[in-house]
């Protein structure tokens, strides 16, 4: 979506490297070793860095990874390396994923399943809670892996609605957290204050 796209532009303009990003995650892990870490990125970032090198660098630092553009049909080699290093490859399932494909994805699911609440771009607005509940409930019949809902969740109201109106095991918030950085006029200290307040608000 536009928010994540804009943040990516800022990172590129600042010449942030993959190695610097991984070092930051490593430091965060040291500061909070009781917190699970899952990273989300595109396959080309990993390939350019070197798949084996990337996985070696995140071993023991992250618990899972979401490679948003890695097709299920082409994941075998990458997944094998991740499994060997105890890193979960998080599966993405959308309203457009048919039952046969869902079964294939869920068979290999570890950590949690990321259910995309709506078609379109991240940070979208309207959510159909009845449809989300129907689809999440169907997925939960096929797996014991927790099913979390993401896309379009940007407020306490949204979080409460997912909690009360669906059978989801949790929520995923991305764009809204980045938006808070822009709300803080990219002032880091102000951002941390706003972010902490927001996270406390959406905790269920």
What residues fall within each predicted segment?
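Active-site-adjacent beta->alpha loops and helix N-cap segments on the catalytic face
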Residues: 1-6, 12-26, 46-52, 67-84, ...
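Surface-exposed amphipathic alpha-helices with a cationic face
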Residues: 25-32, 59, 79-83, 133-143, ...
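Hydrophobic faces of well-ordered beta-strands that scaffold small-molecule active sites
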Residues: 37-41, 65-67, 89-93, 113-115, ...
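Short, ordered loop/turn segments at secondary-structure junctions
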Residues: 42, 69-72, 94-95, 118-120, ...
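Short, electropositive alpha-helical surface patch
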Residues: 43-63, 164-175
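Histidine/lysine/aspartate-rich catalytic loop segments that bind and position anionic ligands
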Residues: 86-123
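Catalytic cores of alpha/beta
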Residues: 97-108, 149, 153-171
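Catalytic cores of soluble, metal-dependent hydrolases
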Residues: 171, 177-186, 192-199, 203-204
């Amino acid at each position: 979506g536009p928010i994540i796209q804009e943040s990516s532009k800022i990172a590129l303009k600042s010449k942030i490297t993959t190695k610097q990003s991984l070092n930051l995650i490593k430091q965060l892990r040291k500061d909070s070793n009781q917190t699970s870490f899952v990273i989300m990125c595109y396959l080309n970032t990993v390939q350019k860095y070197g798949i084996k090198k990337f996985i070696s660098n995140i071993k023991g630092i992250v618990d899972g990874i979401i490679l948003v553009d890695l097709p299920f049909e082409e994941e075998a080699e990458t997944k094998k390396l991740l499994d060997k290093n105890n890193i979960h490859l998080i599966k993405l399932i959308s309203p457009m994923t048919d039952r046969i494909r869902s079964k294939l994805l869920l068979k290999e699911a570890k950590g949690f399943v990321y259910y995309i609440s709506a078609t379109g771009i991240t940070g979208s607005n309207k959510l159909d809670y009845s449809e989300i509940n129907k689809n999440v409930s169907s997925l939960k019949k096929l797996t014991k892996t927790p099913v979390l809902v993401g896309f379009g969740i940007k407020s306490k109201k949204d979080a409460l609605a997912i909690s009360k109106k669906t059978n989801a095991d949790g929520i995923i918030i991305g764009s809204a957290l980045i938006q808070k950085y822009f709300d803080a006029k990219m002032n880091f200290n102000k951002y941390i204050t706003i972010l902490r307040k927001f996270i406390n608000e959406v905790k269920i």
